[in-house]
Each structure stands twice: as structure tokens, then as C-alpha cells.
Amino acid sequence: LAGESLTDLKKAPKTLPNKTDPEIEKVIVEYRKKYPAIGAVKLHRIMGNDNYTDLPSPRTFNEIFKRNGLITREASTAATHYQRFEKSYPNEMWQADFKGNFKMENGIRCHPLNIIDDYSRMNLCCEPLLSETFSEVKPHIERLFSTYGLPFSFLCDNGNPWGTSQSTGFTNFEVWLMELGVLTLHGRFIHPQTQGKEERFNGSFTRECLKYHKIKDQTDASKIFEEYRDFYNNIRPHMSLNLEVPSSRYTPSTRKYSSKISEWEYTDDLKVHKVKSNGIHNNSRARILFK
């Protein structure tokens, strides 16, 4: 992660009752430099989790930040609270999105794929891909399904590979999830706030990770992204979780994934037609277009 190393700060019980204010302030400043985009309340919780006691209030943390020139406009913006919907249990809905692509030092563009669980905010995937095609995305989502099980629904935007700019037909991604019994949901066009938690994650990912690293190549990106994912899930407190971490609220799905797709079963009162590869059946007015 960004900033200075804290290798000398052991996770043994620490109390500062007899320390002078400058000594307390020095430790707080060291933590702030390690986590420069983390606000006072969350940093206060992180230090508490690291077994520091008798800490000053988060308000005093902010005063210390100001005295030491450690308050940024980005951090203030990130502290703004928003009203959001929330699902009732883990894996009821996953949210997926590509963070805006950027050029790595080797000249190749990186397309970060991020997927979070709506209920717990657990980041399930933070992968540096080289494109946004279904063929590149699918193996990573299959790995998630094998590791965490199947969600009940999957919220994504209308861009590749999730959706289409047209209102007709289904994408390969939608058909695949349909066969697995997972409902695909799409955000409203030009309304990214529908995926507020995923957009919020992308913002945190940018401020707390990408801003502080020059990424050489895909291998380097994978290492940096995984380090941030561990921090985000297991160390970083979340205001919406009462300052708990996502991993404390997440449990895998009981719906197991199988790469073998079951055959569809129909009742006797339904007539089954074969269609062409484009989804059109010539002897019927019904037209289902697969793209």
C-alpha cells in the first residue's frame, strides 16, 4: 500500500497513557502517512484494532492531520455520506464494474475488473485484465463461482461484456448466467449511481491504491491489486458496516457452481422450437436475438 512502512509497529498491546501529546501525535501521523486517503474515524478504528489504547477522539485526529498538513480535498470528499439501498444477506446480489482503464509503464492498457458483494461490501475480485471481452472475463467469474458459490443476482452496467446498447436480445454473458440460474440486472443508462457501492469502491481503489503506484505490467498490477484487496476486506473499516470490515460479514453462497449446464425442462403444454444461431425462428413471430 501507499506511504511509509510500519514494519516496526508490532501488533502487541500498546498503551499511551503516560506519553506526551507530541509522542501520541507522532504515531498518529505515521499511520496517516501509511494510509493517506483514510479518514479520522476509520484510522482511529484501525489503530484500535492494532491494540493502541487511550487514543484521542477522531475529532482530535482531524486536528492533528490539519496541523501536519495531512488533510486533502479527496479525503474530505470521500467522507461524504450517501443514502444507499442494501441487500439483506451475502450473495443476494453481486455488483460488477470495470474501473476506467489506464496505460501501464509497458505501454499496455490495464482494465481493472472489480466485483463486490452488495450486503457485506466484500471485494470478491480485483483483477487487472487486458480487455473487457466476455472471453477474458468469463474465467475470472468462473473462479469466483467455484470459490464463493453462485449469487442470486448480478448487477452490472450496460457496457461490454455485460449488456448491450440496444434494448433487444441477450449477450453471451446474460445467457450464461441465465443457464446458471443467476438473474442479470442492469443499471439505468447514464445512471452510474445505480451501482453506488461498486462506484464507491472504484473511487476508494483509485484514491487509496492506484494514486500511489506506478504499475509496470500485468504481473505487477496483480500483486498490487491483491494487496489492496486484502487491506480493503480485512483491515479498512467501513462506515456503513459500523466500522467493521467486510470479511466479518461475508459468508460463501450455499448455491454451488457446476460448469455442466443442466438441460432446460418444460411442461407438456409448451411447444419447443429450435432456433437459428441468431435466435430467430422463421415459423414464429417471436424473435429472440442473441448477441
Predicted regions and their residues:
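Basic, flexible linker segments flanking DNA-binding modules
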Residues: 2-96, 101, 171, 247-255
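Short, polar/charged, Gly/Pro-enriched helix-capping and turn/loop motifs at alpha-helix termini
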Residues: 42, 75, 151, 155, ...
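RNase H-like DDE/DDD metal-dependent nuclease/strand-transfer catalytic core used by mobile genetic elements
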Residues: 88-95, 100-112, 118-220, 224-226, ...
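Residue-level "edge-of-site" marker
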Residues: 60, 78, 158, 189-191, ...
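K/E-rich alpha-helical interaction surfaces of small helical-bundle regulatory domains
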Residues: 1, 36, 226-242
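C-terminal, beta-rich DNA-binding module of retroviral/retroelements integrases
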Residues: 233-291
